[in-house]
Amino acid sequence: MKLLKKGTTVLFVMIMAVMLVACGDKEESKTFSLSQNGVDSKLTYTYKGDKVTKQTAENTMLYTSMGIKTKEEAEKMLKETSEKFQNIEGLKESIEYKDDKAIETLEVDYTKISSEDLKKLPGMASTGDVSKGISMKESEKMLKSQGFKEVEK
């Protein structure tokens, strides 16, 4: 009887340990924003521990800030840059053209994109060796130094 009780206790402790480990790596997110020169940027980072797993950017650009007036001019101006983001595994990019602004949505899945592709992307800033992963703490520090503010939930 004592052996059965001891076995049950050990099993209970093991189950609790597994549950605590599983809860310890909970996925979280932080959002940062910046309005500058007619462009509103909202960046959302999804991370586990200190490792960023996904980043989503939404950039709203007024045509007047780009020195143009129409969505046709915007399409012509942004087409070449947008094409550089296409057909890369782990990356989705789209631009929606409105009457007075363009809204770009960019999503990077760091669990799928290669570090070589990541280094080639226009406008991507990073410090350190990206092949080892993206640090949430370093990303937050870099964003705040560029003027981004954290958006409280």
UniProtKB/Swiss-Prot annotation:
<keyword id="KW-1003">Cell membrane</keyword>
<feature type="signal peptide">
    <location>
        <begin position="1"/>
        <end position="22"/>
    </location>
</feature>
<keyword id="KW-0449">Lipoprotein</keyword>
<feature type="lipid moiety-binding region" description="S-diacylglycerol cysteine">
    <location>
        <position position="23"/>
    </location>
</feature>
<feature type="compositionally biased region" description="Basic and acidic residues">
    <location>
        <begin position="135"/>
        <end position="153"/>
    </location>
</feature>
<dbReference type="GO" id="GO:0005886">
    <property type="term" value="C:plasma membrane"/>
</dbReference>
<keyword id="KW-0732">Signal</keyword>
<keyword id="KW-0564">Palmitate</keyword>
<feature type="region of interest" description="Disordered">
    <location>
        <begin position="121"/>
        <end position="153"/>
    </location>
</feature>
<keyword id="KW-0472">Membrane</keyword>
<dbReference type="InterPro" id="IPR036699">
    <property type="entry name" value="YehR-like_sf"/>
</dbReference>
<dbReference type="InterPro" id="IPR009736">
    <property type="entry name" value="DUF1307"/>
</dbReference>
<feature type="lipid moiety-binding region" description="N-palmitoyl cysteine">
    <location>
        <position position="23"/>
    </location>
</feature>
<dbReference type="Pfam" id="PF06998">
    <property type="entry name" value="DUF1307"/>
</dbReference>
<comment type="similarity">
    <text>To E.coli YehR.</text>
</comment>
<protein>
    <recommendedName>
        <fullName>Uncharacterized lipoprotein Lin0239</fullName>
    </recommendedName>
</protein>
